[in-house]
A protein has these predicted regions:
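Bacterial N-terminal signal peptides that target proteins for export
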Residues: 1-11
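Asp-box/WD-like beta-propeller blade repeats and closely related beta-sheet repeat scaffolds
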Residues: 102-103, 108-133, 139
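Beta-rich, blade/repeat-based domains predominating
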Residues: 29-43, 50-55, 60-61, 79-95, ...
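A short beta-strand motif characteristic of beta-propeller blades
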Residues: 25-27, 72-79, 112-118, 154-160, ...
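Short loop/turn segments that connect beta-strands within beta-propeller blades
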Residues: 67-71, 107-112, 149-154, 203-207, ...
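Short loop/turn segments immediately following the C-termini of beta-strands
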Residues: 50-52, 100, 141, 182-184, ...
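A short loop-to-beta-strand structural motif that recurs across blades of beta-propeller domains
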Residues: 60-65, 102-104, 145-148, 198-200, ...
Length: 292
């Protein structure tokens, strides 16, 4: 997520496709959409909107919308009254959404926020990922922190290190937490960086940080998902979806979508959901069965 763009674009973009891309219904349910999450049991895409343009104030005007697998709008305000919600994940019938108050635990069937899990001293809580046992991990981009929430528990600070380099997108991969970084800030609280971000891995047992792919800089990274042995990341600044091969080779999958944020993935259907923050759109990209 990038928080300092002033305006939203409304122009319909021509989209490059890989196996076919489809725009969700051109209705007004989205306002600065930040995250798309696929929930297989309900066969739904959930998309968070900051609300109020790029505002990240605790103003209660953010919401989550629900779309079908094909991208049809089902509920424009599935849950509302939120404070600039960003990253999302799900586990055990619950949707977990990060907003300015902390992590919201939402009962999916009841469409009701059950509790808010406070993130102590968080600066800009952003993305969230879940392990198989239900443990949650939350990135704090400006704070260079990652929080951990054990099932049924409160949040604790897990890793705090400048080596996290503006942690943004998170993805659990076996015994490690993969981190897509924005890049090292030139100064505290600045979005300007000394270089673009890269990919890291944090060991789930002891929290040690490993720089991946020989430390190559990739971009000002936002979202991160994995499929098979391939990673997909978004570069917010360039509006680009990138594929990262197991060798570290980076290739462009799609370009021209300003403010590409926290993507989601339907691994069974091999479909990626892309929220375009500056264009107020959800883009569904079918990777096809033969994507490398």
């Amino acid at each position: 997520m990038h928080l300092n763009r002033a305006s939203l674009m409304s122009t319909c973009l021509a989209l490059a496709t890989l196996g076919g891309a489809a725009l969700a219904d051109d209705l007004p349910p989205l306002d600065a959409p930040e995250s798309a999450h696929w929930h297989a049991p309900s066969q739904s895409w959930y998309v968070s909107s900051l609300g109020g343009g790029m505002s990240v104030a605790r103003d209660g005007i953010g919401w989550i919308s629900r779309y079908s697998a094909a991208g049809q709008l089902l509920e424009a305000r599935w849950v509302e009254g939120l404070d600039a919600p960003t990253g999302m994940t799900s586990h055990g019938g619950m949707l977990y959404a990060v907003d300015r108050a902390g992590v919201l635990e939402i009962d999916i069937e009841a469409r009701r926020v059950l509790r808010t899990i406070v993130l102590p001293d968080a600066v800009t809580p952003n993305d969230i990922a879940v392990a198989d046992d239900g443990t949650l991990f939350v990135s704090d981009m400006a704070g260079n922190r990652i929080y951990r929430i054990l099932p049924g528990a409160t949040a604790t600070l897990w890793v705090s290190d400048a080596a996290l380099e503006g942690p943004n997108g998170l993805w659990v991969d076996g015994e490690r937490l993969l981190v897509a970084t924005w890049g090292p800030a030139k100064e505290q609280g600045s979005i300007e960086t000394t270089r673009p971000g890269r990919l890291l891995a944090v060991n789930l047992d002891h929290g040690s940080i490993q720089v991946l792919f020989n430390g190559q800089s990739i971009g000002h990274l936002d979202g991160l998902v994995g499929l098979d042995d391939t990673l997909y990341v978004t570069d917010w600044m360039t509006g680009t979806l990138l594929r990262v091969a197991p060798t570290g080779a980076v290739s462009t999958v799609m370009a021209g979508l300003p403010g590409l944020a926290d993507l989601g993935i339907d691994p069974s259907g091999r479909v990626i959901g892309l929220p375009a923050m500056q264009d107020n759109r959800l883009v569904l990209l079918n990777l096809g069965e033969t994507s490398p």
